[in-house]
């Protein structure tokens, strides 16, 4: 949250999606305590307006307003295409072996999303992880099948490159490790 607020002059409204808000949800198999709550957002917003979801461990170096104002071209979702995502065995040795829409950051047109997400009640009772069912329902890992539903946002909004800091190690002694911080160049 700090990095979002630090890098904007715009009003930001934040709703933390805490497990206590969803006490009846089946959460077996989730990767995090909040994995599938993100799909409740359109209904939580009354299927009106836009919403922006980010995982809580995201660090932002740019004003999120630039992402917020992204034109979704009439589509319900904006996401990054993760071309490195390894898919399950049924896609091995096919063009879909890698690649998936990444929901770590999503821009959502809540009204248009209504027909593509199940109700909160249905999601709460979902057997398995709703995330994977949702992603397959919108076309992942078949990118071309989902072009009418997902606007691809700039991959830099979900970057894992780690280029902002260098850690030169001079010794094997942990007490002697030097960490150098370099000024960030203008991002984008």
Predicted regions: what they are:
Residues 1-37, 44-48:
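N-terminal anchoring/stem segment of glycosyltransferases
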Residues 28-33, 91-95, 167-171:
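Short, surface-exposed amphipathic charged segments that create phosphate/polyanion-binding patches used
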Residues 20-25, 85-86, 158-162:
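A short acidic, often aromatic-flanked loop/helix-cap motif at beta-alpha or helix-coil junctions
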Residues 37-85, 107-110, 115:
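GT-A fold catalytic core of metal-dependent nucleotide-sugar glycosyltransferases
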